[in-house]
Structures are given as C-alpha cells and as structure tokens.
Design a protein with these regions (language model features):
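Compositionally biased alpha-helical segments
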Residues: 1-2
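Non-catalytic, surface beta->alpha helical segment in thiol-disulfide oxidoreductase systems
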Residues: 6-47
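Sec-dependent signal peptide cleavage junction
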Residues: 44-59
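Oxidative protein folding and maturation machinery
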Residues: 55-167
Length: 167
C-alpha cells in the first residue's frame, strides 16, 4: 500500500518483473475504456513510466502534454498533473482552452465561481456550449456557484454564529 501510494480502492497496477511501477489506473471505468488503459499500460512508450521519462527528458509538445495529463489523471497523480497542466496552458492561446479536447483541463483550473478563469467561461459561454454542449457547460457553471455555498452549508464559515439581528 505504501510502496505504490495506494490511498483508496480501486487501484490497478502494472508492474515489471522486479515490482517497479509501469502504469497505474485509479478508479473504475467501463470495460472498453479500462481495456484501453490496460493496453496503454502495457506499451512502454505510452505507459505512465514511459511518458514520465519523456517528460523529464524535456518533451513538451502540445499533443504529448495533453496525453500525459490524461495518463496522470487516470493515475490519480494530482500534484504532478497540476504542474503539467500549468505548462500546457501556458503554451496555449486562451481561445484554445474552449476546444472540446481541453474542457477537462480547463475545468480543472476552476475551484468555484470566484476562480480567476471563471469569467473567461462566462464571457465565452456560447463558444464553450458550441464545443462541449449546453448541458455540460450549464451543469458545470451551476457546480461552480454551488461550491461557493459549501462553506456555509457545512458551517465552515461560522454561519450559525452570524447574528442576523446585527445587520
């Protein structure tokens, strides 16, 4: 558990004969996607370890970074993923963030409706809808507004101590 940094289940690990991690898949998925992930893990060029070596070697083209971010996502390597996302986003023209292939990357940059990039989503709403679909975009915007309310719903902000009579 400690050696492979397993924090919860399900974790699927592909190891070499010496027990070294080659690829990691965290969470469940439908069978076709799971098969794709396992096939990737068995490919030395596309597995987590292979792609990490390429990244450390300086590989930084857009397609590679997008693919690597996807691998890091499936491996639940959030800290490293976030640093790769920052490199990736810095290479893009802001309008490229609107594209469907960048939706999950763009949304990972947002914590809630107060996030720095949230106004970009609202200002480019029609373009995001055209690329990603109205339901997906609308649902995501709703979630961003709801996240602002979470601290009050769970009393992280001292809501119960707030005295309405003082207002």
């Amino acid at each position: 558990v400690t050696k492979y940094q397993i924090r919860y289940f399900a974790h699927y690990l592909i190891l070499d004969s010496k027990g070294n991690l080659l690829h990691r898949i965290v969470g469940g998925s439908k069978l076709p996607e799971f098969k794709e992930q396992v096939a990737r893990g068995l490919n030395p060029e596309r597995c987590l370890t292979g792609m990490t070596e390429k990244f450390r070697g300086g590989k930084r083209d857009i397609d590679f970074l997008r693919d690597y971010i996807n691998v890091l996502d499936h491996a639940d390597m959030k800290v490293h993923r976030d640093s790769v996302v920052q490199i990736y986003v810095a290479m893009l023209d802001p309008q490229e963030l609107i594209k469907k292939e960048n939706w999950s990357i763009f949304t990972s940059l947002l914590e809630d409706a107060n996030s720095e990039r949230f106004p970009f989503l609202l200002e480019n709403y029609d373009a995001f809808v055209k690329e990603n679909g109205k339901d997906i975009v609308d649902q995501y915007i709703s979630v961003m507004y709801i996240r602002i309310l979470y601290p009050f719903l769970f009393d992280d902000k001292g809501y119960e101590k707030f005295n309405i009579q003082k207002v």
